[in-house]
Amino acid sequence: MSLMLEPNPTQIKEERIYAEMGLTDEEFAMVEKILGRLPNYTETGLFSVMWSEHCSYKNSKPVLRKFPTTGERVLQGPGEGAGIVDIGDNQAVVFKMESHNHPSAIEPYQGAATGVGGIIRDVFSMGARPVALLNSLRFGELQSPRVKYLFEEVVAGIAGYGNCIGIPTVGGEVQFDPCYEGNPLVNAMCVGLINHEDIKKGQAHGAGNTVMYVGASTGRDGIHGATFASEELSESSEAKRPAVQVGDPFMEKLLIEACLELIQSDALVGIQDMGAAGLTSSSAEMASKAGMGIEMYLDDVPQRETGMTPYEMMLSESQERMLIVVKKGREQEIVDLFEKYGLAAVTMGKVTEDKMLRLFHKGEMVAEVPADALAEEAPIYHKPSQEAAYFAEFQQMKMETPKVENYKETLFALLQQPTIASKEWVYDQYDYQVRTSTVVTPGSDAAVVRVRGTEKGLAMTTDCNSRYIYLDPEMGGKIAVAEAARNIVCSGGEPLAITDCLNFGNPEKPEIFWQIEKSVDGMSEACRTLQTPVIGGNVSMYNERSGEAVYPTPTVGMVGLVHDLKHVTTQEFKQAGDLVYIIGETKAEFGGSELQKMLHGKIFGQSPSIDLDVELKRQKQVLAAIQAGLVQSAHDVAEGGLAVAISESAIGANGLGATVKLDGEATAALFAESQSRFVITVKRENKEAFEKAVEAIQVGEVTNTNEVTIHNEENEVLLTANVDEMRKAWKGAIPCLLK
């Protein structure tokens, strides 16, 4: 590979070799202007990865600026490895979500595993100890053998990495829709805890300070991974397996412990993960953020393959590597510290004052580029945006209630839809109890992890109903944030902030860019109303296969603060005789619903609507009632409507059922997906206090009959279902489809 002669600057220009690396003609002309000369092969490589959408957000920056990113608890917003939010008592929570979609489509096990590894490094590079992992996954329909393979391997990859490294995977979501068949989405989220004084930044301050490389050695895996993530998948993508990195969770476990010990040392100046674009992004970004330059000697890079060129070393995305800056003269302490963990720490450069990134190899300077040009000065594009053709058509459709003959059969069929069915097959492969801090395990509205040494907990969830967002990006964007907050509140937490993972098709298509703009508008409005700022995130574009885009899927990862663990609330019924309440009104809203998809095989019409002020009021009332000790169980009403929510609360309990009376047209009462609704149970003696605190309607009570019976307002039975049979259908659906 490396014995081939690299093309010279003139050949790069004349033969348009830069275009193969992902640069446009205009961008190459900009590079020429910045340097005042033609770039060589290595320099062209540096610009091509740093100016890719994946690293520069050149197509999405104008949209991302709409997000609210500040708040009284926000200690670090977007721009560093991960965002940080204050949780009181000198402690803070650090969290971020990232995508690993393209690699997972091609090499699902390693693609998913290294996605987990990368997001963990983003969190501990801030100085935090990772305490929990979540994920948000999208696949095609499980009837397809290829989808089964991708699903099984992605879950195995997440489990393999998370379990080995000893961080519990506590929650997440999995949804299935035909549009993800060729392009699955794998979004991984990591949550960590930190004391305020331990917060570190990825900045290279102090001229003369030493640049060191720590962790695993560099190979040829993942070269141009960032560029690969910035183009559409095609048949030829299979050939890009080398662009998928290979992870080693045991190496990463050692790296976490070594870095967390390093962070206690005053020798450390700055630290950054070598993620997308490897050594290039970590060095250029650390220099640029500090207003400094960096010189690096590439002969000193630990290499696990022979004859690597500067281009290959700079663009490799080998895993489990960090770049650190330490005070001059303190290098040996760092070497000794890492040696204790069996890890390499080598000096490979120094911080300079002139803002240049200079690379040397075999005694020659092989690249000289302004650090800011790579990190900050990528061109920004305001892409044309055009309302999707389908949108007006869907908006004009009048709301129709699907025809349902047999309510019980329909409920059982919904419980067996893979998007609604139990995800136990998934999370049983994850060790969600390791570190013994998990208070609420997977399967409820949000996971809860205790904050050791305090009475507090962290509630966390990932949410996004991409069908709603496809039908109406702005409304759907509001709903994604609101549903995440609703899940946090149902678990007894106060929503704090979000991280987002914006998964979309090709932004060069005006209709796709319109989806991006509108959904971000909706999310931003919801974040402002619910006071949950965006503290970081990730953009994943070009999620298309053969020109067909996935649904717009801006996933929301939210963390909330449980002020006292005695407030922790779960969705399952607690005891017979408790009263069942519903909060929120039900309308005949079926656009994008599970029922619509099940009956028609497609989605159409208007998405459910949401009033954010009403949402906020209800969330505040529910949280106050939970904190006052008035609530036995709480569950948000989502996919499948009230019938599914009530059934899930019964399935999670032991031997309990419920008798409930619902007003209005039966199909809507049972299965509509109207927003801002909760199913709450309350002890009989708390009835008066609860009704004073919360606007809710009592609809029935919890029974010990092991049956769910739902009546209409005339008291006619709409359905009676045995809870054991429902549980069997709900739990057995995914294993059955995988056989």
From Swiss-Prot:
Where does this polypeptide localize?
Cytoplasm
In which broad location class does this protein mainly occur, judging by the first location in its UniProt entry?
Answer: cytoplasm
Q: What class of enzyme is it?
A: ligase
Entry keywords, A to Z: ATP-binding, Cytoplasm, Ligase, Magnesium, Metal-binding, Nucleotide-binding, Purine biosynthesis
The residues that the entry says bind Mg(2+) 2 are 122, 273
The organism sits in which domain of life?
A: Bacteria
Question: What single Pfam family name could you report for this chain, choosing any that match?
Answer: AIRS_C
Which positions are annotated as binding ATP? 57, 96, 500, 537
Write down the EC number. Answer: 6.3.5.3
KW Magnesium (keyword) present: yes
Amino acids binding substrate: 99-102, 121, 245, 317-319, 540
Pathway-wise, it operates in: Purine metabolism; IMP biosynthesis via de novo pathway; 5-amino-1-(5-phospho-D-ribosyl)imidazole from N(2)-formyl-N(1)-(5-phospho-D-ribosyl)glycinamide: step 1/2
Q: Which residues form the active site?
A: 54, 100 (proton acceptor)
* GO molecular function list: ATP binding; magnesium ion binding; phosphoribosylformylglycinamidine synthase activity
Q: Cite the SUPFAM superfamilies for this sequence.
A: PurM C-terminal domain-like (SSF56042), PurM N-terminal domain-like (SSF55326)
Q: May I have one GO cellular component term?
A: cytoplasm
Query: Which residues are noted in the entry as Mg(2+) 1-binding?
Result: 98, 538
An example GO biological process term is: 'de novo' IMP biosynthetic process
Q: Which reaction does it catalyse?
A: N(2)-formyl-N(1)-(5-phospho-beta-D-ribosyl)glycinamide + L-glutamine + ATP + H2O = 2-formamido-N(1)-(5-O-phospho-beta-D-ribosyl)acetamidine + L-glutamate + ADP + phosphate + H(+)
Subunit structure comment from the entry: Monomer. Part of the FGAM synthase complex composed of 1 PurL, 1 PurQ and 2 PurS subunits.
This chain's function reads: Part of the phosphoribosylformylglycinamidine synthase complex involved in the purines biosynthetic pathway. Catalyzes the ATP-dependent conversion of formylglycinamide ribonucleotide (FGAR) and glutamine to yield formylglycinamidine ribonucleotide (FGAM) and glutamate. The FGAM synthase complex is composed of three subunits. PurQ produces an ammonia molecule by converting glutamine to glutamate. PurL transfers the ammonia molecule to FGAR to form FGAM in an ATP-dependent manner.
What family is it from? Belongs to the FGAMS family.
Which NCBIfam families does the UniProt record give? FGAM_synth_II (TIGR01736), PRK01213.1 (NF002290)
- In Swiss-Prot or TrEMBL terms, this protein is called Phosphoribosylformylglycinamidine synthase subunit PurL
Which species is the source of this protein? Bacillus cereus (strain AH187)
